[in-house]
Amino acid sequence: MKGKTVKESSLVSSHLMLMEHSGNFLFVNNRPIGMVHGGKIMTLMDEIAGMVGAKHSGRHVATAVIEKMQFFAPIFIGNKMILKSSVNYTGTTSMEIGIRSEAEDLITGKITHTNSCYLVAVAIDDYGKPCKVPQIIPETDDDKRRFKEAKIRNNKRLEERNS
């Protein structure tokens, strides 16, 4: 099975955050003010990770682990949410996928790093069983750093699972 580079399976997506993405909001000067619900952010991050995993493996994938979901800053209604996602590391049947979320204030243009997480997806064959994935080929220094860090995280996950 031929490997794939990080850029071959990475994705970037944008979403306008609307009132229905918020748990609560109010109007100030006829503008909706409120924060996007964390569950909506997590859903969008899981969805893009699934797309990256499918793009990399050529298979449907199942989420096995969502690790280290961190919320650094809120995303507000009216912001553009930007998701950047790529495969950091591959095992035999699984892939660690890194996701970075940013919020862009469309009025000021200011971009804020809001969330990050790692997700492990498992490729699934036509019978619902885990199947092999192409190995990731890190090219850039950043790709290589992410690969090295992801390998350490993967080894820790394996240790925890086997203890």
At which residue positions do the language-model features occur?
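Terminal targeting signals and extreme-terminal segments of soluble enzymes
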Residues: 1-163
